[in-house]
A protein has these predicted regions:
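Short acidic, glycine/proline-enriched helix-loop-strand junctions
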Residues: 151-155, 320-324, 402-429, 448, ...
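N-terminal donor/sugar-recognition subdomains of glycan-related enzymes
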Residues: 1-261, 265-282, 291-295, 299-300, ...
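Active-site gating loop/helix substructures
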Residues: 343-364, 413-450
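Extended, hydrophobic alpha-helical segments in both membrane/secreted and soluble proteins
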Residues: 283-289, 325, 379, 395
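Glycine-rich beta-alpha junction loops
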Residues: 168, 397-402, 409, 476-480
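Glycine-rich phosphate/pyrophosphate-binding loops
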Residues: 136-137, 289-290, 297-307, 383-407
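Active-site/ligand-binding-proximal alpha/beta "capping" segment
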Residues: 334-398
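Generic beta-strand/beta-sheet core signal
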Residues: 262, 286, 306, 328, ...
C-alpha cells in the first residue's frame, strides 16, 4: 500500500474504484466526500475575508482535522484533538486488533465500524480469505483515507466495500451481496469510538438490525419456498370466483374509520368496547383474531389471511358469520375449501411471477398491498387503500405482556387442549414461543419495559416508520409503545369523533355487494388455458433441465479427476454452454421456477448453509461446476413440483363437478 501526502489523484482513483464495484453506492459516497471537500475549501475562503462569526454554518465543519506523523513515519489523523491511530506505530496497533480473530480457515467477512485512515483494513486484506466491509460515519474521514492510500484495486475487486451514513437498506444489501452467508466478525475501531462513540455505536446497531432482518427473511424464504408454490397453484381454481382487492380501494372515501384488530394478548381486554361501539367503524380482523372475536359475539367485516401454513386454516374453521376473506394467493389452500360464504371474498396481488396467470398488470388490475412482514401490517395497508378516515389499532402488542405469546381463546391455544400431555404442557408451548428468538426489551404502554424479540421489533418499526396519510390511533391496553402513533381511549375517541352509523352501514353493504357480484365464466376459462399452456411449456423445458443436471454431474466428477478426462471436459463444456444458453433464454419459466428454489439460489449466491466445501472453494473450476450442479438439481425439482401441482389444478378447474 503506497502512502503519499493528501493527493487529489489518489482520491479520484479510489472514487473511480468505488464506482466500478457498485455504481450507485460509489456515486453516493463520491458525492459526499467531494461535498465535504468543497465545504472545507469554501469555509477556508470565507474565513480569510470574514470573521469566524460571519462564516455560514453550512460551510463550517463541526470537527477539526489535522495530519500528524507517527514515530514510524506514517500519517495519523487527529480529529478534534483525538488521534485515531497510535502515534507510535499504527501498523502494530492494527495487527494487535486482529489478533485472535480467525482469518485463514474459510471465507470470512470483517465488518469495521470506523477505521480511521484504514490501517486495520490494509492489514486485514493481506489475508486472502477475508473480505473487509468498512462502515464510516463521517465523509471527512473517508476523504482523508482515500486521499492518502490507494485502495482502488481492492475496491474494484470487491475485497473492500465501503458504506457511509446515512445508510439505506438497499445500500446494505448491495454491500453484502454474495458475502452475507460467510461468518462475520464485528470489529469496532478504538480511535473512532474514542472520538465519536455514539456515531460509531449507531453503525453497529444498524448492522445488527440488518442481519437480524436478513436472517428472518432468508429463514422465511427457505422454509416456505415450496409451500408458497403449492398453495398458489392449488388456490387458482378458487381465486377465479373471488374479486381483486383493488375493487375495495377507496370504498370508505375518507368518511369511515377502520379498526384493524390484531391477536395480541391484550385483545381480550378490549372485546367489550369493540362490541359496544361495533356500529361506528369498519372492522378488519387478522385471521388469528377471528374466532376470539366471533366467540365474543363480534363479527368483523373483513378477515385478512396471508399465512401459507396449513395451521392457518384452523383459524377459519367453524366460522359462519358474514365477514369476507381478504386472501393472499400463497395462503394455505385448505382455507378456500372450507364451507361458508366467507370464501366469496377478495384476493391480493403477489410478487410471485405466477400472478400473471390472473393478470398481465397485477398491481393495476388486482391491487398491491404494502407488505410489512405480518398479517397485521398488510391489514393496516389495506385500511389505507380503502381510504379510511382514521385507522384504529387494537391487539397490536408486538410483545409478550403477562408472559403470554397470544390472546387467550385463540385457536392456537384451543388446539393445545387436544395435544397437551404430561410432557407437553401449554405453559411449555407458550415458553417456547417466547424464547424462540433472542430476548429484546421495549417500552410498554403501561410503563416500564416488556419482553419482545427481533422479529416483533421489525413489525414495530414498520408501524412507526410507515408514511401515514391519515391519523392512526392505538387503542391497545397493553403492549409496546408505537412511537408516533398516539394512544387513545376507545370511549373518549368515539365521543370526540362522531361517525354516522348509516355511513358505516352503507360501506359495509357495499363491501358485501362487491364480493357477491357473479364471477365471469371467462375468468376460470382463462386460468385453465394459461395453466395448460404453462404445463406444455414445462414438458419441453424439464427435458433440457434434466439433461443439464446429468451433464453437470458428469462435469463435476471429471473436473475432480481432471488429468483423466481433459478431452471429455472440453466436449461436455461445449454442450453445457448450449444448454445454459437455452435455459437462460426462457426467462418467463426461469422466473416462475426460481421462486421455489430460493434455498438453492442462496446457496449459490450467498453461501447459505455452507454452499461449497473447502475443496470446492480452493478449486475455482470445481466450485463453478458445483454451482452449476446445484442450479440444475434445483430447477429439475422445481419443474417436477410445478408440473404436478399444475396438473392437479387443471383437473379440478376443468371438472364439471367443480363449482367456481
Amino acid at each position: 500500500m503506497m502512502y503519499s501526502d493528501v493527493d487529489e489523484t489518489i482520491l479520484r482513483k479510489n472514487l473511480k474504484g468505488l464506482s466500478v464495484s457498485n455504481p450507485s453506492l460509489g456515486e453516493k459516497i463520491s458525492q459526499a466526500v467531494l461535498d465535504s471537500r468543497a465545504a472545507e475549501n469554501a469555509s477556508d475562503a470565507v474565513s480569510t475575508s470574514a470573521p469566524a462569526s460571519n462564516v455560514p454554518s453550512t460551510l463550517t465543519s463541526s470537527s477539526s482535522f489535522e495530519i500528524k506523523t507517527s514515530k514510524t513515519g506514517l500519517p495519523v489523523l487527529v480529529a478534534d484533538g483525538i488521534a485515531l491511530h497510535s502515534l507510535m506505530d499504527p501498523i502494530t496497533e492494527s495487527k494487535r486488533l486482529l489478533d485472535g480473530l480467525k482469518k485463514e480457515d474459510e471465507e470470512r467477512v470483517f465488518l469495521f465500524f470506523g477505521a480511521g485512515l484504514g490501517y486495520v483494513v490494509q492489514e486485514t486484506l493481506k489475508f486472502k480469505n477475508v473480505t473487509a466491509v468498512w462502515m464510516e460515519a463521517d465523509p471527512e474521514i473517508l476523504r482523508y483515507a482515500l486521499s492518502l492510500f490507494d485502495y482502488s484495486e481492492l475496491l474494484e475487486s470487491g475485497k473492500l466495500r465501503i458504506l457511509l451514513t446515512p445508510l439505506l437498506e438497499q445500500d446494505l444489501y448491495a454491500a453484502f451481496r454474495g458475502i452475507s452467508g460467510f461468518p462475520i466478525s464485528f470489529i469496532p475501531h478504538r480511535g473512532s469510538n474514542h472520538w465519536k462513540k455514539d456515531s460509531y455505536e449507531e453503525l453497529r446497531f444498524i448492522a445488527e438490525g440488518f442481519f437480524h432482518k436478513k436472517d428472518v427473511n432468508i429463514s422465511t424464504l427457505t422454509r416456505f419456498e415450496r409451500i408458497w408454490t403449492r398453495n398458489f397453484i392449488s388456490n387458482l381454481p378458487e381465486l377465479a370466483d373471488m374479486k381483486p382487492i383493488v375493487s375495495l380501494f377507496g370504498v370508505c372515501r375518507g368518511k369511515t374509520d377502520i379498526l384493524v384488530c390484531g391477536a395480541g394478548p391484550s385483545l381480550i381486554l378490549s372485546l367489550d368496547e369493540i362490541r359496544i361501539f361495533r356500529n361506528n367503524y369498519i372492522l378488519i380482523a387478522v385471521d388469528t383474531a377471528l374466532m376470539v372475536l366471533w366467540n365474543a359475539g363480534i363479527d368483523p367485516d373483513l378477515v385478512f389471511s396471508v399465512d401459507p401454513q396449513a395451521l392457518n386454516t384452523k383459524y377459519l374453521e367453524g366460522y359462519t358469520g358474514s365477514a369476507r376473506i381478504v386472501f393472499d394467493p400463497t395462503s394455505s389452500y385448505h382455507s378456500l375449501r372450507l364451507p361458508g360464504t366467507f370464501k366469496n371474498g377478495f384476493f391480493t396481488s403477489s410478487p410471485f411471477p405466477l400472478i400473471r396467470i390472473l393478470s398481465s398488470k397485477p398491481e393495476e388490475e388486482i391491487g398491491a398491498i404494502d407488505f410489512g412482514g405480518s398479517v397485521s401490517t398488510n391489514a393496516v395497508s389495506l385500511a389505507e387503500k380503502m381510504e379510511a378516515r382514521n385507522i384504529l389499532l387494537v391487539g397490536q402488542d408486538l410483545s409478550f405482556p403477562d408472559k403470554l405469546a397470544h390472546c387467550k381463546g385463540a385457536v392456537l391455544e384451543e388446539r393445545l387442549n387436544h395435544i397437551e400431555s404430561r410432557k407437553f404442557r401449554r405453559e411449555y408451548h407458550n415458553h417456547k414461543q417466547m424464547t424462540a428468538l433472542p430476548v429484546k426489551r421495549a417500552r410498554s404502554i403501561r410503563g416500564g419495559e416488556l419482553r419482545t424479540n427481533e422479529k416483533l421489533l421489525i413489525f414495530k418499526k414498520w408501524f412507526e416508520d410507515h408514511p401515514k396519510k391519515n391519523p392512526w390511533f392505538n387503542f391497545g391496553k397493553d403492549g409496546v409503545v408505537l412511537e408516533g402513533i398516539p394512544g387513545a381511549n376507545f370511549a373518549e375517541y368515539i365521543q370526540k369523533n362522531e361517525c354516522d352509523p348509516k355511513t358505516v352501514r352503507s360501506v359495509r353493504d357495499r363491501i358485501l355487494q362487491i364480493a357477491d357480484e357473479p364471477a365471469h365464466a371467462r375468468t376460470a376459462h382463462k386460468i385453465e388455458n394459461e395453466l395448460k399452456t404453462l404445463f406444455e411449456q414445462l414438458k419441453g423445458f424439464s427435458e433440457k433441465v434434466t439433461r443439464g443436471r446429468i451433464l453437470s454431474e458428469r462435469l463435476y466428477s471429471q473436473i475432480r479427476a481432471e488429468d483423466k478426462f481433459k478431452d471429455q471436459i472440453l466436449k461436455n463444456l461445449k454442450e453445457m454452454d448450449g444448454i445454459d444458453e437455452e435455459v437462460s433464454s426462457r426467462k418467463g419459466l426461469t422466473e416462475i421456477l426460481g421462486m421455489s428454489i430460493q434455498r438453492t439460489v442462496l446457496m449459490i449466491t450467498e453461501g447459505y448453509e455452507g454452499g461449497l466445501t473447502l475443496e470446492e472453494k480452493k478449486n475455482e473450476r470445481l466450485g463453478i461446476a458445483k454451482k452449476s450442479l446445484l442450479l440444475y438439481q434445483g430447477l429439475e425439482e422445481a419443474c417436477k413440483l410445478h408440473s404436478k401441482q399444475i396438473g392437479k389444478a387443471i383437473a379440478r378447474i376443468s371438472d364439471p363437478k367443480f363449482e367456481t
